[in-house]
Amino acid sequence: MVTASISLRDVGRTFGATRALAGVDLDLKPGVTGLLGPNGAGKTTLLRLLATALPPSQGKVRVLGLDPEVPAERTGIRRQLGYQPQETGFPRGFTAFAFVDYIALLKEWTQPAARRAEVRRVLDLVGLSDLGAKRIRAMSGGQRRRVALAQALLGSPPVLILDEPTTGVDPEQRVVLRTVLAELARTSVVVLSTHQTEDVAALCERVVVLDQGRVRYDGPVIDLTGQAAGRVWLADEPDPAVSASWRTGTGRYRNVAARARDDVEHVEPSLEDAYLLLRGGSAEPETAGEVAS
């Protein structure tokens, strides 16, 4: 059995004169890798490259040892890959079951009984077993995201590419989905781009931070979070001298400083704190606005 893997070597992608990715080198093995970065960092472009929806302008991409630029090998990758794009187009009038069944048929699940059983399985995984007969257009945004995730989970693929899978999903279901992804990641490569830094902290051992198309950080989540140790504290007023400061739900301000401070009472840093510190405080956290796209 070949171990699931993805490799990128000096990968770049341009759109006309605009550079979306430059010099990206990554090796991805089974497990969940979180992808963070500000708007326009190149995250969605990177996911589309991994999902074979877009070719690189330079460099080499290999998925499961196959070259997505070779048509026959690209077809082989797509048969073994689950992809949930940031935006999913649903055909008018389709129910959740009909849509996932349609995708399963496209993926060559030709035996009707086995296909229907698999559709029921993935709908159950995402908490939609009771809503299979509901028309997708009548669903909430979070339910639609779960339908999109269900089709990506068909066949427990060795590679799973997810762009904002938990957007609009309620907290209880997000916990359920984390459990599903953690189980799949025991044998599959899962790449997860999300606004929710708490999803990355809960699910991922590894995080990649993109900025302006380049990798700013690639390593353990715990190491990145540790970089903010001794640099985070709560105060009654914002501190203009720190890298980032925002008002929390309690009314106090959470301050993140570029250097350790010994004149304040520190609090345990979060991944969000460390992410802001890495970016020099140039973005605000989810509690006050978007961190990443």
PLM segments and residue spans:
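ABC transporter nucleotide-binding domain
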Residues: V175-V256
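Conserved structural motif at the start of ABC-family nucleotide-binding domains
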Residues: I6, L21-G23, R78
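Catalytic Walker B motif of ABC-type/P-loop ATPase nucleotide-binding domains
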Residues: L160-E164, V169
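Conserved ABC ATPase signature
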Residues: R135-M139
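Conserved ABC transporter NBD signature motif
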Residues: G59-V70, G76-I77
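Helix-to-loop junction immediately C-terminal to a conserved catalytic motif
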Residues: A51
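Conserved ABC ATPase "signature" region
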Residues: D101, L105, A113-L131
